[in-house]
Amino acid sequence: MIPALWIAKTGLDAQQINMNVIANNLANVNTNGFKRSKAIFEDLIYHTVQQPGSKSSEETISPSGFQLGTGVRPITTEREHSQGNLSKTNSLKDVAINGNGFFQVQLPDGNAAYTRDGSFQINPNGQLVTNNGFLIQPVINFPANGNNMSVSRDGIITVRIPEQTQPIRVGKLYLANFVNDSGLSNIGENLYQETEASGNPSISSPGSHGTGLLYQSYVETSNVNIAEELVNMIQAQRAYEINSKVITTADQMLQKLSLL
């Protein structure tokens, strides 16, 4: 079998994965707090006919050697945690992070998760939750007669109570920060969980220890750049076509060999 067939096959597989990643980015262009991914590749092991620096004759040394590549493989999908644009909304419960950090969420099984999606709601128990009903941590309880919710830049939440002149504080939002954001595990529903690669979360007040500030009545939009993704898609398509052409050409070479 001509090695080019296998090499081109690895190229097809790689570009298919690349296209899947691009498609997911484009599918989530309107997802609040979504962070785009990119596929990372590496070349496969080389078949070494002659090592660089080895003797090519008794008196000469090969300056670059003779090594044949065997293809490519994907090694990771890297999440890019660059800032998305802040979009103005009409909801006092929407909160966007401008800078680093994640909101803390408690899952139904008690485990912790983290999100950049600050489109919050208040559940029937008067608690601040995500759109999926997951509790924001630490738990923030709103009085039944509270109104005019206000969120300060550093996360302090206040409401107004009838017949009281001053707003009352009902809680505070804290942000989790990680040494390696890309090491977080995506679990869907705009949520991440920590891993050994991400390191443990560092919990801080917004605006301190490298975390961003909060903006009420805003949501962070997806950081997907449609034009960039379309360019990447065209490049992936062309690479796929080229590898397909290699397979076709190698097949034609095999056919000619079989006639000899």
Curated annotation (Swiss-Prot):
Compositional bias, Polar residues, is annotated for 52-67
Can you tell me which residues the record assigns to a coiled coil?
A: none
Q: Would the keyword Ribonucleoprotein turn up in this protein's UniProt record?
A: no
The UniProt annotation puts the region (Disordered) at: 52-71
List the GO cellular component terms: bacterial-type flagellum basal body, distal rod
A biological process term (GO) from this entry: bacterial-type flagellum-dependent swarming motility
InterPro entries this protein is in?
Answer: Flag_bb_rod_N (IPR001444), Flagellar_basal_body_rod_CS (IPR019776), Flagellar_FlgE/F/G (IPR020013), Flg_bb/hook_C_dom (IPR010930), FlgE/F/G-like (IPR037925), FlgG_G_neg (IPR012834), LlgE_F_G-like_D1 (IPR053967)
> Which locations, inside or outside the cell, does it occupy?
Bacterial flagellum basal body
Q: Which UniProt keywords apply?
A: Bacterial flagellum
Assigned protein family: Belongs to the flagella basal body rod proteins family.
Q: How does this protein assemble?
A: The basal body constitutes a major portion of the flagellar organelle and consists of four rings (L,P,S, and M) mounted on a central rod. The rod consists of about 26 subunits of FlgG in the distal portion, and FlgB, FlgC and FlgF are thought to build up the proximal portion of the rod with about 6 subunits each.
User: What is the protein's name according to its record?
Assistant: Flagellar basal-body rod protein FlgG
